[in-house]
């Protein structure tokens, strides 16, 4: 059982006054609880109370009582909680310690001093339960996002913890990977485990969650049975800043036929994966959804066209101008999927204009404009790493807007974002399109595609198998691809 009583917590050097404010919640053994709410509302912080990362890892001011299976977590070390609470983070790479899948799965058991015979027994059982046979012996860095998430779940399961905490586990997963994760979570529930899932994508937990807890500005504003929660319409969920189902009816937009970029045919290979791209003609000002399952070649395509893959001979033609190699970076800008890799400054305000050749006055005015637009002005003096995942995403996008490149690539720009922030991203993408900027949006988010994308590229196994504008046939095909998000 989990008993949280009158808990308030604020992070050291926090952006807001308090991450949690007088929160109380009792969760019986075997219950599956969905924690939802807008970015920065306190969902992730609540999970950190349960798994002991607060106060063992995150410093701050904590008051109240936190009891997990009869133990006061504030009096325990993390290793003492490891057998009771298992955690799966938004980015599974952050919890990997070894190079190979096999050693990663057994790593936690080895660290507890478990007997070899018992480790092997559990390993065999876990591989069968999670259907991991084809992933054994592989380098974890070469796995897709969904495969990494499966290995993380398997590794956590090896210690057989009665409680599991998942922090936005689907934010970087495609539809097929989400289906597999749902199967894993269903197995945990069937064995009587207590499961807490902090999530923005809600649809995949329909029929699994027993209870829904809604956070707002650090407080619990709703605690309802799941059946009651699912009776709400998409519009009612959106009004609370929550994600709903998507009918997937993207808007058709016409572009001038004489104003376009030509992407010359190119090929890129790393020895194991090959990307083959035909000639593409992209209207200027278009917003192109780049779709397909994890590992299909979408991110490689974007990196090649931004000049980030050294051996790739990608080329973009703009009238009489040709951009190739390093020159591509003068035309194209990329917002990475893991935004931590592109946040370098000591303050949010400085990060927006980092690397731009502007005067100090121009930097200040540009940063102010972009931070107001992305509703980050109140965080301007904070360190970027002190922001929530959703706020970091918006900061990286603010940097893309400030750079004023003619072509912008977004790699999962709404990963970790709630409905309102997703709408804000879509609005800014549409605004840039009206300014003539051409944008490519790598995404698994049908709501984002519906709100801002007017063309698409669909990738399978390193090839573009479908592309163009939103014809009735294309919409029907991709509605089928996204159909799981409407279930």
Residue ranges and their predicted role:
Residues 65-80, 315-328:
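ABC ATPase NBD Q-loop/coupling interface
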Residues 117-135, 362-379:
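Conserved ABC ATPase "signature" region
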Residues 139-143, 147, 383-387, 391:
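Conserved ABC ATPase signature
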Residues 164-167, 408-411:
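Catalytic Walker B motif of ABC-type/P-loop ATPase nucleotide-binding domains
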Residues 174, 418:
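ABC-family nucleotide-binding domains
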Residues 199-200, 443-444:
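H-loop/switch region of ABC-family ATPase nucleotide-binding domains
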Residues 219-241, 463-486:
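Conserved beta-strand-loop-alpha-helix hinge in the C-terminal portion
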């Amino acid at each position: 059982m989990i008993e949280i009583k009158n808990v308030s917590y604020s992070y050291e050097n926090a952006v807001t006054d308090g991450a949690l404010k007088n929160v109380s919640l009792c969760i019986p053994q075997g219950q599956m609880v969905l924690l939802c709410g807008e970015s920065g509302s306190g969902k992730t912080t609540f999970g950190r109370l349960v798994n002991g990362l607060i106060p063992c890892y995150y410093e701050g001011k904590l008051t109240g009582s936190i009891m997990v299976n009869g133990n006061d977590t504030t009096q325990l070390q993390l290793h003492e909680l490891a057998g009771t609470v298992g955690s799966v983070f938004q980015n599974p790479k952050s919890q990997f310690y070894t190079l190979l899948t096999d050693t990663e799965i057994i790593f936690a058991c080895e660290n507890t001093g478990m007997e070899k015979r018992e480790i092997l027994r559990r390993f065999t059982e876990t591989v069968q339960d999670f259907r991991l046979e084809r992933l054994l012996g592989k380098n974890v860095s070469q796995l897709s996002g969904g495969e990494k998430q499966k290995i993380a779940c398997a590794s956590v399961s090896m210690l057989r913890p009665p409680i599991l905490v998942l922090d936005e586990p689907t934010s970087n997963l495609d539809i097929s990977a989400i289906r597999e994760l749902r199967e894993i979570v269903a197995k945990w529930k069937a064995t009587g485990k207590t499961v807490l899932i902090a999530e923005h994508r809600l649809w995949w937990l329909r029929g699994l969650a027993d209870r829904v807890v809604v956070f707002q500005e650090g407080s619990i504003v709703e605690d309802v049975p799941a059946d009651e929660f699912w009776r709400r319409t998409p519009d009612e969920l959106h009004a609370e800043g929550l994600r709903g189902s998507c009918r997937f009816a993207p808007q058709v937009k016409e572009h001038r036929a004489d104003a376009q970029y030509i992407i010359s045919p190119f090929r890129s290979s790393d020895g194991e994966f090959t990307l083959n791209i035909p000639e593409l003609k992209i209207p200027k000002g278009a917003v192109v959804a780049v779709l397909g399952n994890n590992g299909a070649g979408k991110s490689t395509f974007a990196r090649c066209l931004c000049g980030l893959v050294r051996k790739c001979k990608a080329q973009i033609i703009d009238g009489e101008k040709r951009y190739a190699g390093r020159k591509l970076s003068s035309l194209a800008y990329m917002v990475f999927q893991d935004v931590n890799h592109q946040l370098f400054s000591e303050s949010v305000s400085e990060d927006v204009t980092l690397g731009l050749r502007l005067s100090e006055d121009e930097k200040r005015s540009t940063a102010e404009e972009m931070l107001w637009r992305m509703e980050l002005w109140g965080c301007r003096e904070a360190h970027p790493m002190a922001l929530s995942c959703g706020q970091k995403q918006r900061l990286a996008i603010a940097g893309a807007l400030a750079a004023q490149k003619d072509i912008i690539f977004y790699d999962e720009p709404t990963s970790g974002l709630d409905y309102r922030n997703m709408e804000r991203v879509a609005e800014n993408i549409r605004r840039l399109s009206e300014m003539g900027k051409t944008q490519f949006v790598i995404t698994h988010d049908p709501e984002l595609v519906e709100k801002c994308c007017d063309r698409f590229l669909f990738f399978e196994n390193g090839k573009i198998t479908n592309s163009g504008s939103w014809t009735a046939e294309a919409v029907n095909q991709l509605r089928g691809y996204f159909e799981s998000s409407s279930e």
